[in-house]
Structures are given as C-alpha cells and as structure tokens.
Amino acid sequence: MTKGILGKKLGMTQVFAVDGKCIPVTVVEAGPCVVLQKKTEEKDGYNALQLGFGAKKTQSVNKPAMGHFKKSGKGAFEFLREVECENIDDHAVGDEITCDGFFATGDVIDVTGTSKGKGFQGVIKRWNFAGGRASHGSMFHRRPGGIGASAWPSRVFKGKKMAGQMGNKRVTTQGLEVVDVRPEKSLVLIKGAVPGPVNGLLLIRKSRKV
C-alpha cells in the first residue's frame, strides 16, 4: 500500500459527534489517484509510485507529457507527485488509488500543503513582535527595533527575524484525526484546519509519530 494519497481542500464545516459535541472539520476530496509510473529499488534505488490527480484538458499538454500520460490510459492530470510504497508489486500502471481502504475513522494523519500567501509583511504580523507604545509621545510603533550591535559583531546575524514574504510555503500539519470517510464521494473529513487555500493540493500520509 502507498504511504500517501493526493487530495484537494474543499473547505471547512462542522459535524456533531454522538455525544452532541460540535467538531470543526476540513472537507478534503482525497483521490481517486492514478498510478502513472513505478519506481523500483532495482532500477531507481527506491520504491515509490508516481500518482496523477485532477483531470486536465489534453489540449494544454505538450507531446512528451502526453506520451507519459498515455501509458496509464486514463487521460492527462494536473498534479503529479511521488509517494512512498512498501509493496510495489501490488500496483500496476493505470491502477486507481481511492480513499476507501486507505482511511478509517479515528486514523491519525499528516497533511502537507502550500500555505496561503500573505505578501510582504512587517515583523508584527510575520513574527508576532510586540511593537512599541501606541501613544504618550512614542515614535516607535510597528518597527523591528535594533537588528544588530555597533562595534561588535558589526553585522546582522543570519536568520534574524525581519519583514519579508509571508506564507506561500510548504507546510505540514501533524497529528490530525480522521473524523469520517465518505468513499462514495471520495471525501474525507479531517478534524481541525489543514494548510492552504480552498482547492489547494494536499498530500495526506499516515502519521509518522504514531
């Protein structure tokens, strides 16, 4: 079985447990993914599957990529990712991997996605700096303050928290719980929030820390 599956974030809602508690959940369309290529330890040095997810118009695909897609016989795909696979011989090119059987209610998973881009932000929003006083004659409000010393070390240390691009980075949220699986619609309900915007690509894997 593969150690991961591709999905798409559809949004957030809430469900009610048997005891009446309200649980915030993220609805994720997990699969179906198609096996496009097999990577074996003998040929490539590791075992993995290349998965395709999300249909794409063939008119917008170049010939080399289309030749790669035709091997599966399932059309073109918008997203291609490699995932680890333990039993590589159990899968063939063209096989579909669905959320049915991959997830079960109560599973603990890790979700990887690209966080929402916030653009260029200052140190208060980006790094939670306290800032200065808002009144009483203060002229220091949202500035970063000192970033180094004068005589020594006479430089700014690497990694100093400063203003800059915020978000739009690969983020993994660990230890999330699967609340419900609805295989007829390829939907998985995950407790809490996951990285990225609506319709963002997600890689869902069984938790490494369980």
Swiss-Prot record:
Record's keyword terms, sorted: Ribonucleoprotein, Ribosomal protein, RNA-binding, rRNA-binding
Signal peptide: none
InterPro entries reported for this sequence: Ribosomal_uL3, Ribosomal_uL3_bac/org-type, Ribosomal_uL3_CS, Transl_B-barrel_sf
Any one GO biological process: translation
Family matches, as PROSITE patterns: RIBOSOMAL_L3
Keyword Plastid set for record: no
One term of GO molecular function: rRNA binding
GO cellular component: cytosolic large ribosomal subunit
Any Pfam family the entry gives: Ribosomal_L3
Record text on subunit structure and interactions: Part of the 50S ribosomal subunit. Forms a cluster with proteins L14 and L19.
Function: One of the primary rRNA binding proteins, it binds directly near the 3'-end of the 23S rRNA, where it nucleates assembly of the 50S subunit.
Family designation: Belongs to the universal ribosomal protein uL3 family.
Name of this protein: Large ribosomal subunit protein uL3
